[in-house]
Amino acid sequence: ETIASVLAQKYKVKKTQGNFNNEIGLPLTVFTLEESDEIAVLEMGISDFGEMTRLTAIACPDVCVITNIGWCHLENLKTRDGILKAKTEIFKSMNPDGTVILNGDDDKLITIKDVYDKKPVFIGIENKSGIYAENIVNNGLEGMTARICNVNTADNINDFDVHIPVAGIHMVYNSMAAAAVGAEFGLTSEQIADGIANMETLAGRNHIIRTDSLLILDDCYNANPVSMKSSIDVLASSKGRKVAILGDMFELGEEEKQLHYGVGEYFKDKNIDVLITVGELSKNIAAGVRTVSACDVHSYDTKDELEKDFSKLLKKGDNILVKASHGMQFTKIVDSLEKLEL
């Protein structure tokens, strides 16, 4: 979304819609391309080896962006090294003269020294070898501000200040990636800053909903341990009573219980008032929280059971994070919260 918003400042852009990022959705997106479209921004989602090879053969990208090597899809990919191997299959059918943009703060991605004898463009906060961010200010749910700097003086972009309308440090990385792509396609610093500042959020992805009773942080499109912790940070930055409604994270393999427990331990010093979990695996989040926080903890087996207790658990003015893997269908919880009167 951030990359598409930036490129749209200069070009006619087609982007992936919803979850059309797999071996069915990607071709359907490509089929919608029109002669007037100048750039396609395509998301590629995988869960096993070989899938990225097939996707990149369809898209043949000129620019490849990998934002991190996290802890998702471990059921098939087993380890973060496996995830790295699967994601870097994207290089197989990319334009050999194209550009690779990587998160230089990621311990796995930083090991990639060249692709087709060309060095990647690294983005980072700690890594300052390419495009980096400094002077980062967290304004809670109002978003972030930062200064994005560029080491490569041959690009069109100079150092610039930017307002990032979506909270979370991950959005700083997304903004740096968008700046790197923008530089590749000849955008100016002003165009990049405008594209980032005017980015729109989608339902289920860091989307803020304000009702008469509640502020809802709808991030229920999907979840893994890295994104779950990022969303907890966003909730922690809000003002007022903080409630996290978290569900199971799928496809984590043999370490699924420990990874859920680790999310719970991440609550330490976050000053979150209430944790509500739904599902069997997320009970491990609750167990982890109890070891590090005085947070009020409640666990439910089903969404229906939880919704019956909304009036007991929630107060008017609460800030509520809703997040789980897509298969948990937490959009139903978001819909119910939107209708709730307290």
Where are these regions (language model features)?
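Short, polar loop motifs at secondary-structure junctions
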Residues: 104-108, 125-126, 279-283
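Phosphate-binding loop of NTP-binding sites
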Residues: 1-99, 104, 110-116, 176, ...
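ATP-dependent carboxylate-amine ligase
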Residues: 4, 76, 88, 96, ...
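Conserved RecA-like helicase motor-core motifs
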Residues: 12-18, 123-125, 295-299
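Glycine/charged-rich beta-loop-alpha catalytic/anionic-binding loops adjacent to active sites
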Residues: 10, 125, 151, 155-164, ...
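Acidic-glycine-rich active-site phosphate/pyrophosphate-binding loop
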Residues: 1-4, 137-160, 205-208
